[in-house]
Amino acid sequence: HIGWQVAVNHRLNATRNPYAHIHKPDITIEEVRSSPMLWDPIRFLESCPSSDGSCAVVISSEMHARLAPRPPAWIHGTGWRTETGHFAGRDEVNPRAGQECAAAAYREAGITDPGTEVDVSELYIPYSWYEPMWMENIGLAPESSGWRAVDEGHTAFGGRHPINPSGGVLSGNPTGATGLLRFAEAALQVRGLAGEHQVDGARRAIGHAMGGASQFHALWVVGSEKP
């Protein structure tokens, strides 16, 4: 039922975001559970759409950021890593590139416990089960415990660590812009400009992008205060 719960959480989150491409305010666990099977165990309503859209992020100097009429998001740390898509012994569920990408960003940001030091995360989750998988991969949850965070409601809107309050990739997947949208949504959160899907008190946020056979990873940590 974990995947079903993730799908419900993200689609309900999307109802607060006017830019989300799927709005299903009446979605239920039963509706997800009974939707057509794509490939076991992923069902239709646990998968992302394919849609059109765009995204832009303006990165400036500190001087120009301070002159802006609205508060900036300060970049605390960044990471990029790539690995070969297929090789003997590769762990596609917990890829090394994802681990090292996150570790690099956390080092730069001075984060030692992302699960408690980050307030909200926008993760690249095209299928429901990627939520607990990426939480473990980038250090938001201990190994084999990501599912528990979902089950206990910690990743829902209003939970201890909300994941994808925008509705995420499950609610809008404009190919080519999807990853950058995660970065932009993280920035909106720490700027206090996320509208109805704003997480109260969000001071630090993660934006995470992924591509290929889970082999390309990018992550940034942004904050409301200058690092």
Predicted regions and their residues:
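Condensing-enzyme catalytic core mediating Claisen C-C bond formation in acyl metabolism
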Residues: 4-5, 37-104, 152-166, 198-204, ...
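Phosphate/pyrophosphate-binding loops at sites that engage ATP/ADP/AMP, CoA/4′-phosphopantetheine
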Residues: 67, 102-117, 194
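Glycine-rich, mobile lid/loop segments that gate access to catalytic sites or pores
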Residues: 1-41
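A short beta-alpha structural unit
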Residues: 78-81, 119-128, 168
